[in-house]
Amino acid sequence: MNSIEKKQLLGLDLNQMEEFLLGLEEPRFRGRQVYKWIYQKECSSFYEMSDLPRSLRKKLDEKARVSIPRVLKQRVGKDGSRKFLMELDDKKKIECVLLPQSRDKKSSYTLCLSTQVGCPIACSFCATGQSGFQRNLKAFEIIGQYLGSKKELSKRLKSPRAELISNVVYMGMGEPLLNYDEVIKSVHMLNDPRGINLGQRRITISTSGEVAGIKKLAQENIQLTLAISLHACDNSLRDQLIPLNRKYPLEVLFPAIEDYIAFTGRRVTFEYLLLDEVNMSRNDANKMVKLLKPLLANLNLIPYNEIEGLPFKKPETAKIWQFYQWLQDGGLNVSIREERGSDINAACGQLRSDYRR
């Protein structure tokens, strides 16, 4: 039996895993054992599953596979950030990033996951969209980024600690809510207490404003954080920066956000890239205060990370703090995101499906 015909076990939930083992004429508890080996120990080799009978390991090797994406290359930034170039079964390539929670390089990490190969949104400031869109990722490929990153991190830091990755953000390559079903499936897999056991409130899904997905997410009863990539507070500018705004302009997007907050009771995070001489005027600040002040919301300001071939520039520090002060004076709950990973092109908007530097 070749690898194409083998059953992909990565991506199965516990019930599905147990049913698969029952189909191999094995007791149900063997499914629980295999499930733990995959999701708690990042194990992709059946022969390393030491508490399984040798005969079962051989049977699994003949009939199943666990395809954790292969790490082709890793880059480590000065701040301890780690960017992984990973290869999928069909040779497509994606990137994901581990960001340290603090600069001591000994803390836990936030993992930034990709959900698509490329991105169809084609935001004008973003490296990912410049490469075009190829396909959606399956849930097992999304979870595989978590398992592959954690395995690599544990190996390099020589630490098996389960808490090495304490938070997950769906902010890598792609628009998560355009791959809705697979993303939500991966969220449930991350959260499963019998497997990875990552708390729902440690998970963030970021969207450029996919209103249909926001409406569906409000019905899921998942206590995650929704982040909105805003970047402009009027339609004319946002149309230029985020083409999706032409489908879902602000007067459509914000009622959906208000409904989401009302239905879930969860605070929404807004992300705002600071683009020098583009979206940082006093008028921009006033518009943002008017939009966000009525909402249960946090605002993260993100100084732009410059990308070769794109015209946008990072603002000077004084301009950043002036804009911050206007927003704070307007009564917003605002913070400036500390830069992570920019020296290895791993910061916001810098991910591609290859290494160009």
UniProtKB/Swiss-Prot annotation:
Q: Where does S-adenosyl-L-methionine bind?
A: G174, E175, S206, S229, L230, H231, N305
Look at the named UniProt entry and state the broad enzyme category this protein falls under.
transferase
Output the Gene3D superfamilies linked to this UniProt entry: 1.10.150.530, Aldolase class I
State the free-text cofactor note. Answer: Binds 1 [4Fe-4S] cluster. The cluster is coordinated with 3 cysteines and an exchangeable S-adenosyl-L-methionine.
GO MF annotations, alphabetized: 4 iron, 4 sulfur cluster binding; metal ion binding; rRNA (adenine(2503)-C2-)-methyltransferase activity; rRNA binding; tRNA (adenine(37)-C2)-methyltransferase activity; tRNA binding
Superkingdom to which the source organism belongs:
Bacteria
This protein's cofactor list reads:
[4Fe-4S] cluster
Instruction: Show the active-site residues.
Output: E95, C348
Question: What positions does the domain Radical SAM core occupy?
Answer: 105-343
Q: Which InterPro entries match?
A: Aldolase_TIM, Methyltransferase_A, RlmN_N, RNA_MTrfase_RlmN, rRNA_lsu_MTrfase_RlmN/Cfr, rSAM
Report the HAMAP family cross-referenced here: RNA_methyltr_RlmN (MF_01849)
Q: Which family does it belong to?
A: Belongs to the radical SAM superfamily. RlmN family.
Designated name of the protein: Probable dual-specificity RNA methyltransferase RlmN
Q: Which gene name does the record give?
A: rlmN
